[in-house]
């Protein structure tokens, strides 16, 4: 199989495994990726979220709408630029971080079971370089 195919099926397997654990808290794998970005930096725009997650703005809108319905985020007009909407985590979302982070650790541990640290390091380097190759201008 090609590296692209293997990357794709691994992404889907990781997403499904994570979603199986997070869905009990009403969070999809896509929403998890948005929350992760907001936990790193709260109060950013939809465009910044889509760029950091690596999704289209349309996909971000859908994920943000679900998070807003679940009362995990709020969206408000940016005070410095009224054309932009700023996304902020609610207290509920901040508390949820402590519950969801262990799920990610669990999924990663299961995925890497039986693989040496040396091989994991090589895989990280290869995946990082393929990403750089594909996103270079």
Feature map (PLM): residue ranges:
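Charged, amphipathic alpha-helical coiled-coil/dimerization segments
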Residues: 15, 65-125
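Short alpha-helical elements of helix-turn-helix
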Residues: 3-5, 25-36, 47, 61
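N-terminal leader segment of winged-helix/HTH proteins
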Residues: 1-25
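Short capping segments at the starts of secondary-structure elements
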Residues: 41-45
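Exposed, interaction-prone assembly regions rather than primary DNA-binding/catalytic cores
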Residues: 119-137
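Residues within the alpha-helical elements of helix-turn-helix
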Residues: 37, 52
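Append "Primarily bacterial transcriptional regulators
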Residues: 49-50, 67
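Helix-turn-helix DNA-binding motif, specifically the short coil turn and the N-cap/start of the second
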Residues: 55-59
């Amino acid at each position: 199989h090609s590296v692209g195919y293997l990357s794709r099926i691994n992404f889907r397997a990781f997403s499904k495994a994570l979603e199986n654990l997070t869905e009990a808290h009403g969070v999809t794998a896509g929403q998890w990726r948005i929350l992760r970005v907001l936990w790193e930096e709260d109060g950013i725009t939809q465009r910044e979220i889509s760029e950091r997650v690596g999704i289209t703005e349309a996909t971000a809108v859908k994920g943000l709408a679900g998070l807003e319905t679940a009362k995990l985020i709020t969206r408000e007009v940016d005070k410095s630029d009224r054309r932009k909407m700023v996304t902020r985590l609610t207290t509920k979302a901040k508390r949820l971080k402590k519950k969801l982070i262990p799920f990610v650790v669990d999924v990663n541990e299961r995925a890497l079971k039986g693989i040496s640290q040396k091989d994991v390091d090589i895989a990280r380097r290869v995946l990082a370089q393929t990403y750089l190759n594909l996103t270079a201008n």
